[in-house]
Amino acid sequence: MIAEKVLFLVLDGISDRPCEALDGLTPLAAARTPVLDRLAAEGVCGIMDSVAPGIRPGSDTSHLALLGYPPQEFYTGRGPLEAEGTGIHMTAGMIGFRCNFATVDADGLVTDRRAGRISGTEPLAEAIREGVDLSGLGLEFRFEAGAGHRAALALIGEGLGDKVSSNDPKKEGVQPLTIRPGSDDPADAKTARACNEFIRQSREILDGHPVNVRRMEEGLPPGNLLLIRGAGKMGALPQFPERYGLSGSVISAATLISGIGMVVGLEHIPVPGTTGSVDSDLDAKVRAAIGELGRKDFVLMNIKGADEAGHDGKSIQKRDFIEVIDKALAPLLDLKNTLILVCADHSTPCSVKDHSADPVPVVIRGPGVRIDRTNRFDEVSCAEGGLHRIRGRDLMPIILDLINKSHKYGA
């Protein structure tokens, strides 16, 4: 029997390194995961370098690689992908950026790069749209709130470049940086000026906004600064249905992932109650994925909360959320005629509080799969599986072969 459907499940940042608080285990190894372990026992396992050994992948470059779009060939910056995911349609002449709502104190020092993982930022975004004016530079802009502390910006106008730096200092207790051009090209200088002006005007708006006033009264960090980075122009990506002969959907509360999916031709399926954080309604997300498999060949589903716990250095919270994920995945065990692939997009070690180059576990379960002897889904157990060590770009060819849609190489 050959599977006709594919569920591609990315457990964002779930992979880790040994944690002292977990007696030297990773959060995944320490968690009770009967569903993931059953998938491992009924499938073929391995470990995977999302981009290449030793390369620390971003969520953008890793997801491109997982979908069979090697970032070395197709990546043009995270900003335009994030913008697409928030509903900003990127066209020629637009420069896209990813943004964070962050917190600065009275001395202008960054005290929280994610403003306490603020949510409900649409009123802040609306105030920025209404109050910021870049017409003096001959430019327009689009700005949209994303999930949690995230947002996206697109600059629109003539003579813009995408080689500019970021104002994000990547640490707290210091001043935000000034955005600078990355070349002598006047187009890059114009973009840098526009970004700095946008940041200046938006900060004036955010400082006194009622949402932030209320947050400060409640002892919460205000979202009173925008950190802008990831500048880029939208590149041309081959469409997924034509590239693979599969219709598809993407289910993700993270605007970056939904943006990548939409850019390559997957239909974005919004799911009420999903947040991209540890409070997300995972049951609703799984139900939506199962429903989409009834009308599409391929469903990409991203679950993100474990990644946030890794970035925050909270190993116990990460372990506990992995157990929540596992429980929510139980209905997938009953899927028929479906190839289920589960992997991480990258490791987010709690000790690093960022992505690392450590390979991630992967399992493929479904009709026709050669079952190996692995019976646990974790970083060490999967390393002993039949897939051995592969790259992210290898996944789609393996999937196509298992569903009998690959093409013979040679006569």
UniProtKB/Swiss-Prot annotation:
Q: Which UniProt keywords apply?
A: Glycolysis, Isomerase
Return any one Pfam family short name: Metalloenzyme
This enzyme catalyses:
(2R)-2-phosphoglycerate = (2R)-3-phosphoglycerate
Metabolic or biological pathway, per its Swiss-Prot or TrEMBL entry:
Carbohydrate degradation; glycolysis; pyruvate from D-glyceraldehyde 3-phosphate: step 3/5
GO BP terms: namely: glycolytic process
- Region Disordered, annotated ranges: 164-190
Q: Which domain of life is it from?
A: Archaea
Q: What is its EC number?
A: 5.4.2.12
Name a GO molecular-function annotation.
Answer: phosphoglycerate mutase activity
Its biological purpose = Catalyzes the interconversion of 2-phosphoglycerate and 3-phosphoglycerate.
Q: What family is it from?
A: Belongs to the BPG-independent phosphoglycerate mutase family. A-PGAM subfamily.
**UniProt cross-references to PANTHER family, sorted A to Z:** COFACTOR-INDEPENDENT PHOSPHOGLYCERATE MUTASE, METALLOENZYME DOMAIN-CONTAINING PROTEIN
State the name under which the record lists this protein. 2,3-bisphosphoglycerate-independent phosphoglycerate mutase
Give the classification, highest ranks: Archaea, Methanobacteriati, Methanobacteriota, Stenosarchaea group, Methanomicrobia
